[in-house]
Amino acid sequence: MNSVCFATPHTKHMDSKMQLTSSPASLWRPWLVTRKDAQTECRRTKLACPYSRPEVPGNTTTDGKMQSFQHPVRLYWPRSKSFDYLFSDGEALLRNFPVQATINFYDESDSEDEEESCDEDDESDVEDCLKHNSHFTAFN
């Protein structure tokens, strides 16, 4: 293994250059966006998509690309398929979805008859409530 070491005299000019390059402000950190980077990205975005919606803060990745989603990501899955989720469909869904997401189950109605029966139940509840209110006001 061969190695070479060069020695040069130390000058004041070199000292000032070292201070400039070793200062914390001059270190490039890809996760920090500088004002210059933000202005350049803003100009590029306005030129490429002049009629686009304004950017949501925190909706960009470190490389400046726009995300097509906003965290927290919720995927809605019908409760009737929750059994399928526990085995294969849900695993495949989360595997193919490129971000961390949670699956939220929701109740779905299979027919309009259920909706009509709910409406009838609501009307009967209102009538019962009115009967109780009239009952209480009669004694007062």
From Swiss-Prot:
GO cellular component, one term: nucleus
Tissue specificity as recorded in UniProt: Expressed in the embryonic anterior presomitic mesoderm and in newly formed somites.
Protein's UniProt keywords contain Nucleus: yes
Region described as Ripply homology domain: 71-106
Annotated domain remarks: The ripply homology domain is required for transcriptional repression.
Source taxon at top rank: Eukaryota
Main location: nucleus
Compartment list: Nucleus
Subunit and partners: Interacts with gro2 via the WRPW motif.
Residue numbers covered by motif WRPW motif: 28-31
Name this polypeptide is given: Protein ripply1
Gene expressing this chain: ripply1
Other facts: Named after the expression pattern, which decreases in a posterior to anterior direction in somites like a ripple.
Organism of this sequence: Danio rerio
UniProt keyword list: Developmental protein, Nucleus, Repressor, Transcription, Transcription regulation
